[in-house]
C-alpha cells in the first residue's frame, strides 16, 4: 500500500495531494541533518514528497516549475554491457548525461511517454551507504536559503529500473515562496567523503 498526504483549506477543499515518504525516511529527516529549524525540516519533507509525487504522476508541468532556469542536472542510466567475448558475461556500466533544464524536461517528457507507469521511492541513507543512518540534509554556510538533500532513490517503470543516490540543491526564498532546485545529480552508489 502507499500512504498519501492530503491538505485542506478552511472550507474543506483539497489544496494539495502528495504521496508520503515512508515513516523511516520521515523520521530520519526529522532527527538528522544540519537544518535550522523544525519548520524548515517539515517544509523540506513536504517538497521532497511533492517532487516524488510529480514524477509518479508524470506531472511534467510541476517538475518544470521546480527547477531553476539555469539548473545543472546530471542524470545517469545503467547499461548492461557484454564483457569480452563471453556471451553470458555482462557488466553494468553507468552512462552520465549533463543537461540544462530544457534538455532535461524534453528527455523526461519522452521517458514519460515511453513508460506506462513510473514508481519512484525515496529512502534514507546512512554513513557510507549503510542502512539505519541519517538522510543527508545540509545547509549552505554561504547562503542560508540553500539546502542540499541527499537520499536513496528507487526508480521503477514499465521498461527501466535502477537504484542509486539522488542529490538535490534547493533554494528556499526568503519571501516564503516555493523553493527551486538548482542542482540535481544521480549516482548508482554512495561515494563517502
Where are these regions (language model features)?
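Acidic/histidine-rich, surface-exposed loop or edge segments in extracytoplasmic proteins
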Residues: 29-32, 80-92
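Short, low-complexity N-terminal intrinsically disordered segments enriched in polar/charged residues
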Residues: 12-57, 61, 65
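Sec-exported extracytoplasmic/periplasmic mature domains
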Residues: 52-56, 68-72, 109-117
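Short, well-ordered alpha-helical segments enriched in acidic and aromatic residues
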Residues: 59-83
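Surface-exposed, charged secondary-structure patches
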Residues: 1-7, 86-163
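Short, solvent-exposed coil/turn segments at beta-strand boundaries
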Residues: 6-14, 142-144, 170-181
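Short, solvent-exposed aromatic-acidic interface loops
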Residues: 18-28, 152-157, 182-193
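Amphipathic, hydrophobic N-terminal targeting peptides for secretion and organelle import
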Residues: 1-17, 187, 192-193
Amino acid at each position: 500500500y502507499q500512504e498519501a498526504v492530503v491538505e485542506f483549506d478552511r472550507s474543506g477543499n483539497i489544496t494539495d495531494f502528495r504521496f508520503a515518504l515512508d515513516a523511516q525516511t520521515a523520521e530520519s529527516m526529522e532527527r538528522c541533518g544540519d537544518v535550522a529549524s523544525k519548520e524548515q525540516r517539515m517544509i523540506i519533507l513536504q517538497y521532497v514528497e511533492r517532487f516524488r509525487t510529480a514524477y509518479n504522476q508524470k506531472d511534467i508541468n510541476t517538475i518544470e516549475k521546480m527547477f531553476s532556469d539555469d539548473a545543472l542536472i546530471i542524470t545517469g542510466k545503467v547499461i548492461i554491457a557484454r564483457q569480452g567475448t563471453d556471451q553470458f558475461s555482462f557488466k553494468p556500466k553507468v552512462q552520465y548525461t549533463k543537461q540544462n533544464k530544457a534538455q532535461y524536461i524534453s528527455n523526461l517528457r519522452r521517458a514519460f511517454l515511453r513508460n506506462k507507469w513510473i514508481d519512484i521511492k525515496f529512502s534514507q541513507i546512512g554513513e557510507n551507504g549503510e542502512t539505519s543512518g541519517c538522510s543527508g540534509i545540509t545547509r549552505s554556510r554561504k547562503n542560508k536559503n540553500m539546502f542540499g538533500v541527499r537520499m536513496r532513490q528507487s526508480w521503477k517503470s514499465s521498461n527501466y529500473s535502477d537504484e542509486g543516490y539522488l542529490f538535490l540543491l534547493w533554494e528556499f526564498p526568503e519571501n516564503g515562496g516555493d523553493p527551486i532546485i538548482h542542482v540535481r545529480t544521480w549516482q548508482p552508489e554512495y561515494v563517502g567523503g
